[in-house]
């Protein structure tokens, strides 16, 4: 009897232990099947950002200790895109190095899915589902086994890797903190449903850079539609400054589309370098502005920072979440640092006769307290008498507070008999300029009350008016505000 009671207690304790283990989920490795994971997770080091020194292996606890994984710091997970060579591209170590320079104590993990990424594009695109699943299982393992907070996890995916990051975020048991999509791939994803591509629901915050969205939506290298909480389109999301369009077209004509990977690389990959720029040049953040269309942005109608209408590009983006996707635009330089300074210019052209000219070339020069920027070219699609025109210009240097500007109307590159018989000229009294970066507005006056602006003639000079008008009539101000808000709203 004593033996029987003892055996009963032992059996009862065993059952109780099993129940407790099952309820607490204390053995996640028993519940997870890591055998199907083909992606590799390389924990890069600051000393060797271009080398796969140590791999973290899901299900193997000792790999975390062997690779010196920091359990108390941020973790960046970098996911590359489609590859022709089957090798890492040169941007990978550059991004790793920049992340460590900004966050020295962090963990920077590079996801290696090169074998799957080297297939024909449609095949590799389909593999993003499996890669996303691999990454999700890896993240869940870290969270469940070590109670690693997913608030410390930031996924960064380029091209196809952006969609793999989105799928991973949708599959984790708890949401990761942030996903940054670096020009997410367009083909096969432009019209895809949210579960199989990057979407705002995949993380607490999703920000996206679109740098190569040329052509029809189904043929655009980068996805055109907004897929995050904030979607930023540098230079309209089209061809990027410094990327030689003429050379690309020449190579296409000579070699066809066999080398398309190299031809589109410059603009497509610019998304990565813009993010790297935000890591390295913390003191020179690029500013983006909310706008409905790039056409409205080109007119300078969206340089407002009211109610979160402007934001930093890249790492230090302000996390603004709205009910709808927020589209933002900005201009950049051709190389690092990419920051420029945006200005809206408004001019009213007075004329005795009703004259309209199209596609007119102009030059504007700005002079300020810190520097100057001369002969900035811009083209007005239309110039008409007795009408106000607004347009966007930008400078690559910080001019400081504006003091003076010059405006010149260039001659056409072709000869026009009408210009010879009836030379065109307008009268300008004032020029209004608004800075996007400082939000300051300045009104410039002609020294003589009004200045003649003639085609091919000398530049008209305007200086800062002695008395800056506060505002127009209240009704007019409200109307102007409503018009700008219509363009800026997302």
Curated annotation (Swiss-Prot):
What are the start and end residues of every segment in region (Important for interaction with lipoprotein particles)? Answer: 417-421
Gene name, per UniProt, is LPL
Q: Which residues carry this modification: 3'-nitrotyrosine?
A: 121, 191, 343
Family (UniProt): Belongs to the AB hydrolase superfamily. Lipase family.
Q: Name one GO biological process term.
A: very-low-density lipoprotein particle remodeling
Q: How does it assemble?
A: Homodimer. Interacts with GPIHBP1 with 1:1 stoichiometry. Interacts with APOC2; the interaction activates LPL activity in the presence of lipids. Interaction with heparan sulfate proteoglycans is required to protect LPL against loss of activity. Associates with lipoprotein particles in blood plasma. Interacts with LMF1 and SEL1L; interaction with SEL1L is required to prevent aggregation of newly synthesized LPL in the endoplasmic reticulum (ER), and for normal export of LPL from the ER to the extracellular space.
Signal peptide coordinates: 1-25
Q: Where is this region: Important for heparin binding?
A: 430-434
Taxonomic source organism: Gallus gallus
Q: What is its EC number?
A: 3.1.1.34, 3.1.1.32
Top enzyme class, one word, equals hydrolase
Which residues are recorded as binding heparin?
430-441
- Annotated region Disordered: the residues are 471-490
Q: Outline the extent of the PLAT domain.
A: 341-464
Naming one, the record's GO cellular component terms include: extracellular space
Q: Which cysteine residues pair off into disulfide bonds?
A: 54-67, 243-266, 291-310, 302-305, 445-465
Annotated segments matching region Essential for determining substrate specificity: 243-266
Effect after changing residue 441 to N: Reduced heparin-binding activity and decreased specific enzymatic activity. No further reduction of heparin-binding nor of specific enzymatic activity
PROSITE patterns recorded for this chain?
LIPASE_SER, PLAT
Residue stretches of biased makeup (Basic and acidic residues): 480-490
Chain positions carrying an annotated carbohydrate: 70, 354, 386
Question: What is the name attached to this protein's record?
Answer: Lipoprotein lipase
Tell me which residues bind Ca(2+). 194, 197, 199, 202
Stretches the record annotates as Interaction with GPIHBP1: 32-53, 443-467
